[in-house]
UniProtKB/Swiss-Prot annotation:
Similarity section: Belongs to the bacterial ribosomal protein bL33 family.
Pfam families reported for this sequence: Ribosomal_L33
Record carries keyword Ribonucleoprotein: yes
Lineage: Bacteria, Pseudomonadati, Pseudomonadota, Betaproteobacteria, Nitrosomonadales
Keywords: Ribonucleoprotein, Ribosomal protein
A GO biological process held by the record: translation
Protein name: Large ribosomal subunit protein bL33
Entry keyword Ribonucleoprotein: yes
The organism's place on the tree of life at top rank: Bacteria
One GO CC annotation: cytosolic large ribosomal subunit
GO terms assigned for molecular function: structural constituent of ribosome
Length: 51
């Protein structure tokens, strides 16, 4: 079953993306480079819990 997760910016701007992932096939935490519109550059986004 796919679970909702939050990808939070490592730039400290407070910006985040929400997405889903299959916990059975990818049990480890996701770390992706995406665009941060607040910082106006590409930064790493780390998976956190969606509250």
């Amino acid at each position: 079953m796919r679970e909702k997760i939050k990808l939070e910016s490592s730039a400290g701007t407070g910006h985040f993306y929400t997405t889903t992932k299959n916990k059975r096939t990818t049990p480890e935490k996701i770390e992706i480079t995406k665009f941060d519109p607040v910082a106006r550059k590409h930064v790493k986004y780390k998976e956190t819990k969606l509250k």
